[in-house]
Amino acid sequence: MAYARRLAGVAGAILLGWLGGWGTAEAAPAMWRVSDGDSQIYLFGTLHVLKPQAPWRTPLYDRVLAEATTVWFEADLSSGDPDSVRLLFQRYGSDPDTPLSHQLPPADVQALARQTDLARIEHLRPWAAALMLSMQPAVARGATAEKGADLTITRAARSERKEVRAFETLEDQARMFAGLPQSSQVAYLSSVIHERRKGPRLRLPFQPASLETAWLGGHLGAGEVTALQADNPALYDAFLKRRNVAWADRLAGEMDRPGTELVNVGALHMVGPDGLPALLAARGYRVERVQ
């Protein structure tokens, strides 16, 4: 199977396609304004994992955060204590009966053993092993979720006594991954293994480190999302399309109320015809890229 070299939202340095048609602004992480007269919602595409001191905060973003009465996230990452998160991961991400090495081609098993301690992940489900493996380069470069945009914004919003809301729970997210067809999970893991072994083949929507430079410049991949849709349609549908449609429905309801709200979700959710800006524009709202 032929895979695209890069997919925005995952570890990658140079993105091949840009999301166009929304206008341009000075280089900064991408943000849109959705409005209908007395209501406005800002959409900000985050990176969940960043290195310390990544210079992503801009005066415009800070003004929007100050103005917003409600601040949205994919999930409330600050609400899960380590023990609860560990239990969720064990419930949805482990498979004591089917070793990973029995599910992968021999070449992938050999490559995986060179990349990590196979014994530690042998009884993880493929999606969980892929997620852990894809995060290792970011961690090695000093990036953490604690310094990521989502948790940084959450702390700021709470300190300013904003209403903090989430589209999903952490369990919703774990259940979504666990519900992927086994073949899609294995394809995802194989892609991550290949990427670590030979360089980028398919950049999947969980972000290690080097996308940071492109994200800071406001760049979003379009062709890469198309590649994901073609090569792993079940993952594309579960991770992006269905969630984006559900979130757009929620936000359309919010547009019935006057005021300003701020949405912070992974940057990949902003890309392409199934991205939040396009979905809300299709509902008749004015959508403009402001950063």
Question: PLM features: residue spans?
Answer:
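Bacterial N-terminal signal peptides that target proteins for export
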Residues: 1-11
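Bacterial N-terminal signal peptides
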Residues: 9-21
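Hydrophobic alpha-helical segments
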Residues: 16-19, 60, 280
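Sec/Tat signal peptide C-region and signal peptidase I cleavage site
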Residues: 22-27
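Structured, acidic catalytic/metal-binding patches in enzyme active sites
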Residues: 28-235, 239
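A cross-kingdom marker for long, charged
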Residues: 234-291
